[in-house]
């Protein structure tokens, strides 16, 4: 019994540490893009990230869910897209209840993108979605 409790404690601590590291990395990534882009609309990729067609229905479901759960007409979310086209970090522009934000984040994680490209190499990028 003691071993099970100890294992649970170790796993919980590991989860918290990883979550903090991921959060810090996300904040650093968003700060980097904020500094790079500022208020300007500039292209920093040869090919910017784009959503794959298979994610179109997921976006429609996201919009429907957001309309039912919030009072906002639309929600803007900045996402860091990794070099494989998977969203890894999320920043909501509006204030949203934590429970709703968690549900939206879970749904946003299912979206898939064609990654940005620089010199024929897939790279991490930022993408803003309106839901």
Q: Which residues make up each language-model segment?
A:
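Charge-biased low-complexity segments
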Residues: 6, 18-131
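Sec-dependent N-terminal signal peptides
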Residues: 4-13
